[in-house]
From Swiss-Prot:
Family the UniProt entry places it in: Belongs to the peptidase S14 family.
GO molecular function list: ATP-dependent peptidase activity; ATPase binding; serine-type endopeptidase activity
Active site location: 100, 125
GO cellular component: chloroplast stroma; endopeptidase Clp complex
Protein name: ATP-dependent Clp protease proteolytic subunit
Pfam families named among the record's database cross-references: CLP_protease
Keywords: Chloroplast, Hydrolase, Plastid, Protease, Serine protease
Highest taxon, organism lineage: Eukaryota
Signal peptide range in chain numbering: none
Job description of the protein: Cleaves peptides in various proteins in a process that requires ATP hydrolysis. Has a chymotrypsin-like activity. Plays a major role in the degradation of misfolded proteins.
Subcellular localization(s) per the UniProt record: Plastid, Chloroplast stroma
Gene name of this polypeptide: clpP
Xref: PROSITE patterns: CLP_PROTEASE_HIS, CLP_PROTEASE_SER
Record text on subunit structure and interactions: Component of the chloroplastic Clp protease core complex.
């Protein structure tokens, strides 16, 4: 049986008494979570939170914790683009798995502020297709769109990892799983967490 969203006390600036509100206090602390497949719903939620928190205070960093098997490309690109658009730096933290679009969002964090937990796994690959569902004439259109998306993803990985195009293209040909230290060597994350340094204060 689900517990639901907890009520937490929140006092608005200028108010004397706190009121109990249905709000996730973690969001108030600017901590965001991607703990599922990337789809339109979670993408819209994260984008809305990033924009809202940026309007509320554009000087405090955002922290996006990722444990995701990946998912849809366009909603993932939406999250990535919003991370680049909002004024606060977005720290990305991989805890568990960042695969497919999860790793793409991970690499989209502010450079020098991308972190992976020691036992995290990161996986990159090329975008998938649904050719088996399409009619013959739709194959060509879908293939062209897929190539454009692959070029976009590849370009971003090249820019944000510092790796040459040929290495990124080769890695995206198949599923490439990496440990946290391998992802750091690959430029997907900047740091591997080893202990609590108190940075989240």
């Amino acid at each position: 049986m689900p517990i639901g969203v907890p009520k937490v006390p929140f006092r608005s600036p200028g108010e004397e008494d706190a009121v109990w509100v249905d709000v996730n206090r973690l969001h108030r602390e600017r901590l965001l979570f991607l703990g599922q497949e990337v789809d339109s719903e979670i993408s819209n939620q994260l984008v809305g939170l990033m924009v809202y928190l940026s309007i509320e205070d554009d000087t405090r960093d955002l922290y996006l914790f990722i444990n995701s098997p990946g998912g849809w490309v366009i909603p993932g690109l939406t999250i990535y683009d919003t991370m680049q658009f909002v004024p606060p730096d977005v720290h990305t933290i991989c805890m568990g798995l960042a695969a497919s679009m999860g790793s793409f969002i991970l690499v989209g964090g502010e450079i020098t502020k991308r972190l992976a937990f020691p036992h995290a796994r990161i996986m990159i690959h090329q975008p998938a297709s649904s050719f088996y569902e399409a009619q013959a004439g739709e194959f060509i259109l879908e293939a062209e769109e897929l190539l454009k998306l692959r070029e976009t993803l590849t370009r971003v990985y090249v820019q944000r990892t510092g790796n040459p195009l040929w290495i990124v293209s080769e890695d995206m040909e198949r599923d490439v799983f990496m440990s946290a230290t391998e992802a750091q060597a690959h430029g997907i994350v900047d740091l591997v967490a080893v202990e609590n340094t108190g940075d989240f204060a």
